[in-house]
From Swiss-Prot:
<feature type="compositionally biased region" description="Basic and acidic residues">
    <location>
        <begin position="1"/>
        <end position="12"/>
    </location>
</feature>
<keyword id="KW-0399">Innate immunity</keyword>
<dbReference type="GO" id="GO:0045087">
    <property type="term" value="P:innate immune response"/>
</dbReference>
<feature type="region of interest" description="Disordered">
    <location>
        <begin position="1"/>
        <end position="20"/>
    </location>
</feature>
<keyword id="KW-0391">Immunity</keyword>
<comment type="function">
    <text>Could play a role in innate immunity against viruses.</text>
</comment>
<protein>
    <recommendedName>
        <fullName>Putative protein RDUR</fullName>
    </recommendedName>
</protein>
Amino acid sequence: MNNSFNKEDRMSSDTMVGSCDRQTKNGAKWHGGVSSLLDFTLIYIQLSTSFQNAGHSFKKQHICSDFEVMDELSCAVYGNKFYYLLPTLTHPSIQ
């Protein structure tokens, strides 16, 4: 499992707080952008082709469990783009 989270220096007009690249145990790769939005964090994940074909419920469960946030998030999948919104303070990668 290869996990990385890179915080970026932010200009006052920039809401981007970092990006994530991960390869899961089954070899699926994804990249995510992390943006602050008021008191919430919007996670945008670009799924690999193999992950796209795995099915909505698997993708949602697998990615959410990888981020170790379960209850306080809303998930949405549109094509190969996966989004979820959660309170910023509960996100383990940007505390």
